Amino acid sequence: MPTGDYDSKPSWADQVEEEGIDAEPLSPQIRKPDPVSFVLDTPREVINGNIKTITEYKLNDDDKTVKIVRTFKIETVKASKVVAQRKNWKKFGNSEYDPPGPNVATTTVSDDVLMTFITNKEDLNNQEEEDPMNKLKGQKIVSCRICKGDHWTTRCPYKDTLGPMQKELAEQLGLSTGDKEKAPGAEPEPAQAPVSKTGKYVPPSLRDGGSRRGESMQPNRRADDNATIRVTNLSEDTRETDLQELFRPFGSISRIYLAKDKTTGQSKGFAFISFHRREDAARAIAGVSGFGYDHLILNVEWAKPSTN
């Protein structure tokens, strides 16, 4: 049987295998990266007014070309010099070659968050109890001898006006009660009846001065009527202490009467204030009448003498 050499055409698979053996492997710099992050072209930026558009092309998982368009709105915000200098700092790491400003791929700018620190009320109460200075806040450490205010007597604003008046009043009261020496030429006091030493009860009508039946009270009452003023247009929240603080700078006060409602206990809007001296009452009328107090205009006038 004749034999001969026959030229056979190489198959396509053999050619591909031979090319794969002869070809050199691709370097890691040229090797195709992961299709998810592979960028076909550099991003293109287009700025139109305050609108910035970035367009780029990538390959997805199916090895298909995808076009990504991102649109940004440019806003101009005034910042302090320190913030502006901090934005010009040189970047490092993976963001070394990024342009100025935050990179949306690595940086997320969120809204400002306002923080409110809430403390426990029990802790505050414990601190107030432990602090000795807080206990002294409600106490009156310093008291003025002239106006009874919370300041030193040497710094009293009424020292020049009330000081001499109080001294003169103290001298008058001392002479009337016999605390000081009697003035020359004064009438001698009547001799008092001897006090019973048996320890028995003596009715007031049989005591010394019992027959006069209050004659000694008449001059004092007339003096109070002459130095009594009437204050009207008071608020419902007014108290005797408020009137004491309001009229005390004008002179020594002997009596304060504030008309109150029997059921509610609130002020009826008027009060009577009696001074020891008529001059002090006149000065109080001139100083307080027309004065704004507790959102009301006070009216001060002389009180009409009682008929009884």
Curated annotation (Swiss-Prot):
Key words of the record: Cytoplasm, Initiation factor, Protein biosynthesis, RNA-binding
UniProt feature, compositional bias: Basic and acidic residues: 209-226
Biological process (GO), any one: formation of cytoplasmic translation initiation complex
A GO-annotated cellular component: eukaryotic 48S preinitiation complex
RRM domain location: 227-305
InterPro entries reported in the protein's UniProt record: eIF3_g, eIF3g_N, eIF3G_RRM, Nucleotide-bd_a/b_plait_sf, RBD_domain_sf, RRM_dom
GO molecular function ontology, one term from the record: translation initiation factor activity
Keyword Cytoplasm assigned: yes
Compositional bias per record (Low complexity), positions renumbered to this chain: 185-194
Pfam families given in the database record: eIF3g (PF12353), RRM_1 (PF00076)
Compartments, record wording: Cytoplasm
Domain of life: Eukaryota
Main location: cytoplasm
Region (Disordered): 1-35, 177-226
Subunit structure: Component of the eukaryotic translation initiation factor 3 (eIF-3) complex, which is composed of 13 subunits: eif3a, eif3b, eif3c, eif3d, eif3e, eif3f, eif3g, eif3h, eif3i, eif3j, eif3k, eif3l and eif3m.
The family this protein is said to belong to: Belongs to the eIF-3 subunit G family.
Purpose: RNA-binding component of the eukaryotic translation initiation factor 3 (eIF-3) complex, which is involved in protein synthesis of a specialized repertoire of mRNAs and, together with other initiation factors, stimulates binding of mRNA and methionyl-tRNAi to the 40S ribosome. The eIF-3 complex specifically targets and initiates translation of a subset of mRNAs involved in cell proliferation. This subunit can bind 18S rRNA.
Official protein name in the record: Eukaryotic translation initiation factor 3 subunit G-A
Phylogenetic lineage: Eukaryota, Metazoa, Chordata, Craniata, Vertebrata
